[in-house]
Amino acid sequence: MKSAISLLLASAATYVGASPHPEPPQLVLSPSTSTGVHGDEATSAIASSAADDVISDSPFLSFHRDLVQISSISGHERKAGDFVAEFLQAHNFTVVKQPVPSKDGRQPDEDRFNVFAYPSGASAAPKILLTSHIDTVPPFIPYSAARVDNDIRISGRGSVDAKGSVAAQVFAALDILERDPSAPLGLLFVVDEEVGGTGMKVFSDSSLNPSPSPFRAVIFGEPTDLALVSGHKGMLGFELVATGQAAHSGYPWLGHSAVSALLPALLRVDRLGDIPAQEGGLPSSPKYGRTTVNIGRMEGGVAANVVPASAHANVAVRLAAGTPDEARDIVRRAVRDATGGDENVYPDFSEWSEGYPPQDLDTDVDGFEVTTVNYGTDVPNLRIHERADGAPVRRYLYGPGSIHVAHGDHEAITVAQLEEALQGYRKLIEAAM
């Protein structure tokens, strides 16, 4: 679905021959050979029991319920962190609560922390790390469960993104450890993934992520519709800024409209994903398709009867190829060409100075559908150090639920998806051991 801003610009673009933004199909690289875990027995149990009874009778589903019932909007994750930490301690894990400051370095109003855990008596440097995040986007949506045909649909904020992954990772680890108490597993549940990745960055820069790396594999949990993800697009953000001179709207020649100055640059930037790279556009790739541009917010002026002295727009770019620095150069040239070199219109990258290129991930475990995704994750926020033996550290991205409902008013997941994710995480752990 196009944004209202892109539709507005597209209307203007009909006069200059701009192309629309076609919706690219999501690339599926290989079909699944997994049969899942929801067979006749599970279907029969669900069909004959009330939803609440099924959930209450399952430690796994009860853990997921209790976690979703805790509001943990980014910046306010403490209660969820305490819940996860206390549960793991009660199940014979050593738990480290790693403090995470706010992005500007000041501690937020409510203390928050990452939860890092490993089996008591085992090494604090596990070979296999399962990780996801406990923060959610706003607003909080209460937990609910209802029978739907032969399944149970669980609704609530975080039920998909990413408390479904958290619950499945915890119980996959418990299942593996019950069979093999010496399994070299670790769990990491971070804060702030939804608003900047500060939690993972703090872990990445800490002694808990040593060099050489102890990790043989890192398994990231996000809603992937139970597919194993071979990679996701990169990310670049910036603000497009224009400055002008205020004046009475009855005498516009006495001022200079920042909004009018901004529009040609916006139109050009909005099309950069559709323009071939050889013609000055942003690059595409066979794996990830087109680079996409979203102008998410515009603001300018103070009143309709005042020539606006300032205007700006926030832009998010999902990179299909290349590096953030290369994309910044393309954006700068596009703005310069669109404005005739007007120095009062420029892209400001200072607020989003990092960015990252496309992230290629491992898919060497059989039994999964393989796909790519367009959303961002904490994958680039975890620096992977070289191992002492020179072997590569495998990175997997997998989880239950659909990203298409993850941030919406109807975020929901099914019991069948959660149970299949439990099996999927076990399979990934066993392959990495």
From Swiss-Prot:
Residues engaged in binding Zn(2+) 2: 161
Cofactor: Zn(2+)
EC number: 3.4.17.-
Keyword terms: Glycoprotein, Hydrolase, Metal-binding, Protease, Secreted, Signal, Zinc
GO MF annotation list: metal ion binding; peptidase activity
Protein name (record): Probable carboxypeptidase ATEG_02905
GO biological process, one term: proteolysis
Protein family membership: Belongs to the peptidase M20A family.
Entry note: cofactor: Binds 2 Zn(2+) ions per subunit.
PROSITE patterns for this protein: ARGE_DAPE_CPG2_1 (PS00758), ARGE_DAPE_CPG2_2 (PS00759)
Superkingdom of this protein's organism: Eukaryota
